[in-house]
Amino acid sequence: MSSKKNKPNPTPAAKPKQVAQDKQPRLWPWAAGIAAFSFLLYLNTVNYDYVLDDFSVIKENFVTKRGFEGIPDLWKYHSRHGYWNSVGELYRPIPMTMFAFEWAIAPDKPTLSHFMNILLYALSGALLFVTLARWMRDYNLLLPLLATLFFVAHPVHVEVVANIKSRDEIVMFGFATLALFFLHKYLTTNKIGAMVASLVSYTLALFSKENAVTFVAIVPLMMYFFTKSDLKKIVLTTLPFILPAIIFILMRKAVIGSLTNPGETYSLDNILVAAKGGAYYANAFLLLGKYLWSLLVPYPLCSDFGFNQIPLTNWGDWRVLLSLLAWARAPK
C-alpha cells in the first residue's frame, strides 16, 4: 500500500462562486417576454393619427418639419419655437430631434412615430424589469416581474403611448432607468466606466424631459432601501448626479431665458392658477388624491386635467380632507 496521503481536490473551491451566480435567474428571457407583451398591448395604436400636443411639436411645427436641417434649431430654442414665435418653457431637444428624423424619413406619416412610441415603451418596460430584478436580487423574482407588468399594463399609460408627443416621457423614463441599471453595476463591480455610463444616461434623460431632475432624489432612496451602503457611501455616490442636473438647468436657462417665469401660465392649462390663497392648497391636495385614486381605480380617465375638468373647491370638500388624510398616513 502506498504511504502517500491523498491530496485534497481543489475543484470544490470554485463551487461557491457558481452558486452565487446561480442565485440570479436568467433575466433577459423574462425581459423579452415583457417587451413582447407591451408591444402587442399597444400595437393597435400604430395607425392612430396626430392628436393633442402632436400638432404643436410635429405637424404644425415648422422647425420639426424642416427635418434634418431643423435639428440644430431644436437644440437652440424651446420645443414649441416652431409653433409659436414667443416665450416657451419646454426644452426637450432629444425627443424633438427624433421627431425631426421621423418627419425627414416619412413626412406627415404618424404611423412611423406611433410605431417608435410602441417599440420604445416595450424596450423601457424590459429594461425596467431587468433593473428592478438586479436591485431587488434578494427578493423573489416574482416581485419585480409583477411590479413591471403592473406598470406597463396600467391604463394611465395609454396616453403616453398613443400620444406621439409623449415620446418625451418614454425616452426620459428609459434613460433614467438605464442610469439606475448602470449605477447598480457600479455599486456591485466598482467599475468607473459603469458610473460614467450612469451619468451619461441621466444627462440624456434630462435633455428628454425636465422632470428627470427628480432622479437626484431617487438615487439615494434606491441605495438606502436596496443596498447595505452607509450614509457616507450614499452621499458620495449621489453627488456626481448633481453636476448633469446643473448643466441642464444652465442650458435650459440660456435657451428659455428664465427659470422662474418663462411665460404666463393660464388657468386653461393649469386649474391651480385660478385658485387663490388657501384654496390653492386645497385644490392641490384634491389633485393628489385624484392621482392616487387613478392609480388604484383607473376609471374614468381624462387626457387633460385642464380648466373645469375638476371644478375648483375648498377645504370644506370631503374629498380634499380624505386626500390629505391618505397622504398624511402614507408610509414614510
Stretch-by-stretch model annotation:
Residues 2-332:
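Polytopic membrane enzymes that build or remodel cell-surface glycoconjugates and lipids
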